[in-house]
């Protein structure tokens, strides 16, 4: 990233803090509704941000939306809230932690699968035991046999990088970690 871009980013961040924008709106709540609505839309949910607000704040389900869609949104909210607790504790990443988060995401919408390689249950956070593609004839994702080792490697590298960044006030490096 170029020096002028870094300086501009830091200037905008300082202006944001000095204006007190974070205190003017409930940013965490706004972010939560937006994140969940858009993330579940990728998976086919048609629940809107307003409908999620009613569901999360008041327990009012959306008319005309399937139970599965609404459970998908509630499950993702639970996983998000749990991940924020882990972040506040600075918990290390581990394969088991990621599987537990996956179980929360898929709690009410995940299924059990029986494959020639064995059975697994997405609602329990089990790692898949089959190949995955993006649509029929689409791009293939990593071979399922490589996933456990690659997840462990990801966790180790992320934990090492986080430890390095906890000892610095370099906002740019902390920001860039979210894209690594």
Regions found by a protein language model. Give the residues of each.
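FIC/Doc superfamily catalytic core
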Residues: 1-180
């Amino acid at each position: 990233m170029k020096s002028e871009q870094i300086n501009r980013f830091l200037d905008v961040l300082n202006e944001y803090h000095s204006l007190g924008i974070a205190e003017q709106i409930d940013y965490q709540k706004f972010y939560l509704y937006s994140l969940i609505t858009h993330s579940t839309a990728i998976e086919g949910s048609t629940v809107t941000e307003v409908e999620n607000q009613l569901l999360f704040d008041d327990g009012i389900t959306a008319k005309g939306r399937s139970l599965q869609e609404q459970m998908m949104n509630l499950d993702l909210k639970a996983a998000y809230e749990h991940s924020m607790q882990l972040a506040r504790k600075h918990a290390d990443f581990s394969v088991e932690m990621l599987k537990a988060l996956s179980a929360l995401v898929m709690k009410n919408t995940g299924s059990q699968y029986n494959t020639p390689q064995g059975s697994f249950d997405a609602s329990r956070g089990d790692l898949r035991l089959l190949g995955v593609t993006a649509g029929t004839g689409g791009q293939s994702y990593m071979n399922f046999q490589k996933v456990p080792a690659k997840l462990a490697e990801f966790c180790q590298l992320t934990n090492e990088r986080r430890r390095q960044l906890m000892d610095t006030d370099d906002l740019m490096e902390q920001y860039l970690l979210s894209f690594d």
